[in-house]
Every structure is written in structure tokens, then in C-alpha cells.
């Protein structure tokens, strides 16, 4: 059988990508609607290198998908799978937080006196910032499978509450938001003005390259 390492709970897509590399998996599967409404639920596939599965590999997967929905598939009893040591539960969120702590100077961020606000949009990022930067002001950081009726895409029209929070508090230096599976980011400045991804990439290149 296929050996499976399964996350203990919901996790973000970057956590699965890191897990694929850390555990030397051949494939990573993320069940998610990504930044879309929950009715779009599907799955993302990650290659052994942690990034999106390459096109030729995706073609192989697509060819194995039937043209019509069918329930005529072989089912394996979960307990039997465990007894045969084919299934192991792992804490991908803990692994991800440990990786972040080892690769970023979080103490320097905490001591910088920068006030951050974060909106995970009810998505898979609800715990990680809370664990890494506990003083961050957060909204929409509880489980809501329907995302409160708003597609969890971090663009300005979906983030009005974060923008208004920054404008009203007047002491927030930066606002961050992530989508449903926490692999897309939105950014606000201290005035509550949205910075699109194109300008965000330019800022990252300017300071990191």
C-alpha cells in the first residue's frame, strides 16, 4: 500500500509544501478551495521538491480521473491502514513554526515595536501568526468553513474590515492578510491603503535581493 503521513488537523498549503520536503514524500495533497468560495473545493498537488506538481505529472493524474463521478472505488478501512503502519499522523503546523523560528529572527521583530494586524480570513493561517507573533492584532481568526460568506481572497474589496481597523486604531504599522489556504498574501500600510502583490514583490526584491 501507499504510505501516508496525514496532518493532525487543518494546515496551510505552505505547511504541506515544507512537509513534503522534510519527510521526503513523493507527493503532497492539499484539499482546499484556495482563495475561492468553499463550493470550489478541490485539491492541489505538490511535487517532491515542495512546489506545484509539474505539468507532465499533472497530465498523468488527469488521465486517471474518470469522466463522470463514480462511487465505485475500493475503500480501505482506516484502522487496518493504521495497523499495517501505512498511516502516520504528523504535526505539520509545529514543524512549520519550528522552521520559521530557525530561519527568521522573530525576537528582533518582537523587539522592533512594530504593531502588526493580521486577517487570516477564517482560513488555515489562524494559528501560525498567533503562535509566532502573539502580540499581533488579529481578526477573523476562528474556524468558519463558509468564510462568513466572503471569498477568502486577500484583495481590497474582501478586506474592508482590516483596512478600517488600521484606520481607526491609528497605531498599526502594517496589516497582513492571507487567503483560505494561506499561500496568498495581501498587505496594508499604516494608513489602511492596500498594496497589491506586484508592488509587494518589488518591495521584497528591493530589501531581500
Provide a role label for each language-model segment.
Residues 41-169:
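Gly/Ser/Thr-enriched, mixed-charge loops and adjacent short helices
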Residues 11, 124, 203:
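Short alpha-helical
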Residues 19-20, 100, 129, 208:
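Broad structural signal for hydrophobic residues in well-ordered alpha-helices, predominantly aliphatic
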Residues 8, 120, 197:
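Small/polar loops that bind or transfer phosphate-bearing groups
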Residues 1-41, 132, 136-188:
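N-terminal small/polar loop signature for handling phosphorylated ligands or for N-terminal nucleophile
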Amino acid at each position: 500500500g501507499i504510505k501516508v503521513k496525514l496532518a493532525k488537523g487543518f494546515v496551510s498549503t505552505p505547511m504541506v509544501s515544507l512537509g513534503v520536503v522534510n519527510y521526503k514524500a513523493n507527493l503532497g495533497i492539499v484539499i482546499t478551495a484556495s482563495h475561492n468560495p468553499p463550493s470550489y473545493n478541490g485539491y492541489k498537488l505538490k511535487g517532491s521538491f515542495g512546489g506545484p506538481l509539474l505539468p507532465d505529472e499533472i497530465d498523468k493524474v488527469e488521465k486517471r480521473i474518470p469522466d463522470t463521478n463514480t462511487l465505485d472505488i475500493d475503500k480501505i478501512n482506516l484502522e487496518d491502514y493504521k495497523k499495517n503502519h501505512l498511516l502516520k499522523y504528523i504535526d505539520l503546523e509545529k514543524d512549520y513554526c519550528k522552521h520559521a523560528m530557525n530561519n527568521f529572527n522573530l525576537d528582533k521583530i518582537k523587539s522592533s515595536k512594530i504593531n502588526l494586524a493580521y486577517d487570516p480570513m477564517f482560513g488555515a493561517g489562524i494559528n501560525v501568526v498567533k503562535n509566532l507573533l502573539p502580540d499581533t492584532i488579529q481578526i477573523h481568526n476562528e474556524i468558519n468553513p463558509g468564510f462568513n460568506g466572503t471569498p477568502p481572497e486577500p484583495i481590497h474589496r474582501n478586506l474592508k474590515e482590516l483596512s478600517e481597523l488600521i484606520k481607526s486604531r491609528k497605531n498599526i504599522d502594517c496589516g497582513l492578510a492571507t487567503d483560505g489556504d494561506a499561500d496568498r498574501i495581501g498587505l496594508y500600510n499604516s494608513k489602511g491603503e492596500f498594496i497589491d502583490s506586484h508592488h509587494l514583490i518589488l518591495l521584497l526584491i528591493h530589501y531581500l535581493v
